[in-house]
Regions:
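His/Asp/Glu-rich mid-to-C-terminal helical/loop segments that flank catalytic regions of hydrolases
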Residues: 197-262
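Acidic/histidine-rich catalytic neighborhood of metal-dependent amide-processing enzymes
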Residues: 64, 85-162, 167-169
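Short secondary-structure junctions
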Residues: 35-42, 75-76, 166-169, 282-283, ...
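Acidic, low-complexity, intrinsically disordered interaction modules
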Residues: 281-335
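A non-catalytic alpha/beta surface segment that caps or lines the substrate-entry region
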Residues: 7, 11-53
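A short, charged, amphipathic alpha-helix used as a generic interaction element across diverse proteins
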Residues: 340-348
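Zn-dependent metallopeptidase/amidohydrolase metal-coordination segment
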Residues: 168-213
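Catalytic-core environment of secreted peptidases
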Residues: 48-89
Length: 351
């Protein structure tokens, strides 16, 4: 059994989506959303559905191809799809991936029209009164199998979160989240949807790549996270080539990152903790990030605060080694000391 069969992918349903016009697809998606307990909002330029998982999924309904792909060729093992007219995987693959994802995760969903014309539908969405309250945004509109494209969003903690699921950061020019993310002030990423050679007649879709990324994203969406804010990538203005340059970007002060999320690993039970020459605390009370920084875990807040001046080692004096796959490793809200004290006081007064 291949991964698509194991995940219940319907090739016939996917092929029908590939053959629909943008208008037909929008009508079809309204029915699909209602079937899965959504109440879709259908407007000129976009289709939105509020979910219960604080993640916004985005894909676009149009393709650049002018001919309906009535002839679809499939490889013998069922993995690859092509059409002599251009199959339109950009972005029907992303649309179908969202339909599969919503079976397991009731995320917020946004389908945009006319992305290929410059994000027309996305701009109409940002001009509407809709403003979903989500922790981050995932678009499924990227070529390849393993890419994560953040465009002008520069939130290192969000990048680390996404890449901890095996995706690799890459660059890109534009997609609907380039418009939606800064509007919602929320970090966003464009993930590979398994298509290749987009905008060409010999475009190809790798259904195995689609299903593998559905599997990874399902695991991602089941992680409890805080809100990842949108942070604009900093560039110095001016260049001899007439473009913005990042040459002096390190000299520009970045926004404060006091309240953020970090991937933190529990320390092994045998770990010894020291402040100066004095042994302190116990390992279960502390967490470590991938840079080796230590944090005290605050169970009352289900959060952490950086433990300045504390270092950890085993009986032989060796520091613990960070592992993203270690049991108990997860993203936690990290507060400054002052924020932690304030929130503990609030929790005490509320009880």
């Amino acid at each position: 059994m291949n991964i698509c069969e194991a995940m219940g992918m319907s090739i016939s349903h996917f092929e029908s989506i590939l053959k629909m016009t943008q208008r037909e697809l929008k009508e079809h998606l309204v029915q699909q959303l209602r079937t899965h307990d959504y109440e879709p909002v259908c407007k000129s330029g976009f289709l939105y559905a509020e979910g219960t998982v604080p993640v916004l999924l985005v894909a676009h309904l149009d393709t650049v191809h002018t001919h309906r792909p009535d002839i679809i060729c499939c490889s013998e093992d069922g993995r690859y799809l092509m059409s002599p007219y251009g199959i339109g995987g950009d972005d029907r693959a992303g649309v179908y991936m969202i339909l599969m994802l919503m079976r397991e995760c009731h995320c917020h969903i946004l389908f945009c029209e006319d992305e290929e014309l410059g994000g027309v539908g996305a701009r109409k969405f940002t001009n509407s009164k809709l403003r979903p309250d989500v922790n981050y945004i995932v678009e499924l509109d990227r070529r390849g199998r393993n890419d994560a494209v953040f465009y002008h969003c520069d939130n290192p903690d969000f990048t680390e979160f996404v890449c901890s699921f095996g995706f690799k950061e890459n660059s890109g020019s534009f997609s609907d989240i380039s418009v939606v993310a800064p509007h919602l002030k929320t970090a966003a990423v464009n993930i590979s949807a398994g298509y290749f050679n987009e905008h060409r007649p010999h475009e190809m879709i790798d259904t195995y790549a689609m299903c593998e990324n559905i599997r990874r994203l399902t695991a991602m969406f089941r992680q409890n996270t805080c809100h990842f804010p949108y942070k604009e990538r900093v560039h110095a203005r001016g260049s001899m080539f007439g473009e913005q340059s990042s040459l002096f970007a390190p000299m520009v002060e970045r926004p404060s990152r006091a309240a953020t999320c970090k991937l933190l690993m529990p320390l092994p039970e045998e770990t010894r903790l020291y402040m100066g020459q004095h042994q302190i605390g116990s390992a279960p009370e502390y967490r470590m990030d991938r840079s080796g920084n230590l944090y005290m875990y605050l169970e009352r807040l289900n959060a952490a605060v950086e433990a300045e001046g504390v270092f950890a080692c085993d009986a032989g004096g060796h520091p613990p080694v960070f592992s993203a796959v270690c049991e108990g490793t997860r993203f936690l809200q990290v507060y400054t000391y002052e924020e932690a004290v304030e929130k503990l006081e609030q929790a005490k007064n509320a009880s």
